[in-house]
Amino acid sequence: MRPPMRGGGGFRGRGGRDGGGGGRFGGGGGRFGGGGGRFGGGGGRFGGFRDEGPPSEVVEVATFVHACEGDAVTKLSQEKIPHFNAPIYLENKTQIGKVDEIFGPINESLFSIKMMEGIVATSYSPGDKFFIDPYKLLPLARFLPQPKGQSTGGRGGAGRGRGDSRGRGRGGSFSRGRGAPRGGRFPPRGGSRGSFRGRGRF
């Protein structure tokens, strides 16, 4: 499948830019707004795309949910968490963009993909699959509460950036980087009390 090329017009929803007042992805006050549990942002913006070449292997990481302001909002289909800014591919290893922000409950997380120039998020349909280099994934356990004296391992190396990861609440949470969330909320599902929030980079 070849990546779709840019067409005319951007995504627009009802009641504001994308279905809500003030929120980038449809809610009040937050970029991925809604009502309910806390969520957060991820790696922030990055300038340009560096061609790293296709990996030797790709695995499914997410399915398309909807487009918003040029980005693709996707639901994580992996048990592991992608690195911020990790390249995202089609099944044929054609790169279409990079991981931009991760948000939502830990057990049903979503992330947005910043599309490469010339590729349009609105050209994808719900359920379309996206892929990632398996070496760009981190174990979920790295973001859950750990007993004192224990640390989580797994591939991916130590976290890079200004933030840290620490569990909060019975379900655990992701807290990374510079300050609080941007004010939006995302409803948790499945009874999980954990969530992704904060800004930072792996």
Swiss-Prot record:
State whether keyword Ribonucleoprotein applies.
yes
* Stated name of the protein: Putative H/ACA ribonucleoprotein complex subunit 1-like protein 1
By its UniProt entry, which InterPro entries does this protein fall under? Gar1/Naf1_Cbf5-bd_sf (IPR038664), H/ACA_rnp_Gar1/Naf1 (IPR007504), Transl_B-barrel_sf (IPR009000)
The task this protein performs is described as:
Required for ribosome biogenesis. Part of a complex which catalyzes pseudouridylation of rRNA. This involves the isomerization of uridine such that the ribose is subsequently attached to C5, instead of the normal N1. Pseudouridine ('psi') residues may serve to stabilize the conformation of rRNAs.
Annotated region (RGG-box), positions in chain:
6-48
One short Pfam name that applies is Gar1
List, alphabetically, the Gene3D superfamilies matched: Probable tRNA pseudouridine synthase domain
Which keywords annotate this record? Nucleus, Ribonucleoprotein, Ribosome biogenesis, RNA-binding, rRNA processing
Give start-end positions of Gly residues composition bias: 151-160
Cellular localisation: Nucleus, Nucleolus
Q: Which proteins does it associate with, and in what oligomeric form? A: Component of the small nucleolar ribonucleoprotein particle containing H/ACA-type snoRNAs (H/ACA snoRNPs).
Entry annotated with the keyword RNA-binding: yes
What are the BP-aspect GO terms?
A: pseudouridine synthesis; rRNA processing
Top-level taxon of origin: Eukaryota
Region Disordered: list its residue ranges: 1-37, 144-202
Source organism = Arabidopsis thaliana
User: Per the record, where are the segments of Low complexity compositional bias?
Assistant: 173-190
The Swiss-Prot or TrEMBL record describes its family as follows: Belongs to the GAR1 family.
